[in-house]
């Protein structure tokens, strides 16, 4: 666990300053990175010539910042271009200590298969440092384009290959035995699903009884799971967290990762494909993509999780309904037909369990 405890703590009297704001200041970043980051990248002989800071689109209270640094060798007085280089890093900040756990996990994954190997085209961002004084985690920037953006283009011939690669990446993750994974909390899950149920019942009173019963059934099935089948899951394995670059696939955002049912990641990913097809009216054969995804996964790992994929597809469909019409209620008014559609899809999945 390689944390960097800084001597220069946030100045007294800056209580109202968000710690992440320091990393939006080019002068601060240049000095900070030269002292604390470049040595960790074996770049101590370089100085920062220029720093470009880009605050990425972020979830509430979870900002991410891209740092593009142009470096020059300190021993290169002539500033020859061949002595210059650039690097792209991403810093993530939270107001809790979850990123400390995430950093530990990424370091363990890096050392247990994601640093090198025959399948080194299946990647994670390289963990660089965690700064507890600022609750900031720093990692390399993922190269390529989001699979979610490619999905919206609807080119099945291109998507098929990357979705198969996504299955290989997930099998690689699920095959790794980790020590630093956070345990799944059934208590947290119960509270979360209860809130989703209450919100959706408020938005769709005509479907309230059915919605409540579906959430209860999902929770009952989760309570009955045998923890012997649990392993490390990503927890938010969706196309927007997957970057493709030629043959390489890099997956980001491990904050929801924990020790739980591997089928969760499978069902969640497939549900994202299905919801994207409906939302954007994409000309995709999602059933075929699902089959190819699961076939590739089970060719590399146990078929045991397949019998529970429907459970997590069902959960994800209701999560999608909640996110679209409750979390995003300022943009989307309740849609009775859409609600009926996702309830039907949820029931279909649970009937097969």
Where does each model-flagged region fall?
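An alpha-helical support segment within catalytic cores of ATP-dependent transferases
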Residues: 28-47, 52, 114, 178-234, ...
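Active-site activation/catalytic loop segments of kinase-like enzymes and analogous catalytic loops
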Residues: 263-301, 314-332
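Short, contiguous acidic/charged loop-to-helix segments that flank catalytic cores in large enzymes
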Residues: 94, 157, 240, 254-260, ...
């Amino acid at each position: 666990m390689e944390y960097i405890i800084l001597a220069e703590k946030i100045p007294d009297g800056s209580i109202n300053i968000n710690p992440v704001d320091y990393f939006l200041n080019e002068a601060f970043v240049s000095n900070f990175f030269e002292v604390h980051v470049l040595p960790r990248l074996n770049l101590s002989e370089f100085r920062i010539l220029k720093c470009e800071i880009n605050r990425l689109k972020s979830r509430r209270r979870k900002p991410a910042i891209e740092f593009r640094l142009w470096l020059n060798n300190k021993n290169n007085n002539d500033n020859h271009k061949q002595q210059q280089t650039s690097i792209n890093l991403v810093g993530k900040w939270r107001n809790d200590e979850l990123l400390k756990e995430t950093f530990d996990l990424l370091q363990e994954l890096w050392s247990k298969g994601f640093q090198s190997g025959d399948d080194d085209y299946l990647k994670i961002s390289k963990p660089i440092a965690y700064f507890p004084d600022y609750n900031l985690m720093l990692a390399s920037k993922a190269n390529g384009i989001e699979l979610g953006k490619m999905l919206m283009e609807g080119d099945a011939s291109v998507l098929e290959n990357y979705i198969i690669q996504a299955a290989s990446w997930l099998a690689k993750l699920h095959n790794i035995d980790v020590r630093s994974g956070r345990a799944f909390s059934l208590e947290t899950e119960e509270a979360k699903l209860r809130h989703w149920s209450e919100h959706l019942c408020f938005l769709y009173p005509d479907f309230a009884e059915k919605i409540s019963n579906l959430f209860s059934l999902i929770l009952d099935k989760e309570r009955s799971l045998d923890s012997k089948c649990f392993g490390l899951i990503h927890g938010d394995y969706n196309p927007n967290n997957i970057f493709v670059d030629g043959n390489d696939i890099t997956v980001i955002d491990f904050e929801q990762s924990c020790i739980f049912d591997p089928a969760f990641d499978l069902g969640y990913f497939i549900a994202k494909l299905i919801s994207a097809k409906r939302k954007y009216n994409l000309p995709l054969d999602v059933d075929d993509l699902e089959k190819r995804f699961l076939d590739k996964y089970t060719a590399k790992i146990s078929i045991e999780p397949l019998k529970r994929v429907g459970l997590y597809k069902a959960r994800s469909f209701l999560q999608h309904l909640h996110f679209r019409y409750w979390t995003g209620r300022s943009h989307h008014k309740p849609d009775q037909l859409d609600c009926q559609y996702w309830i039907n899809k949820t029931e279909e999945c649970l009937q097969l369990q």
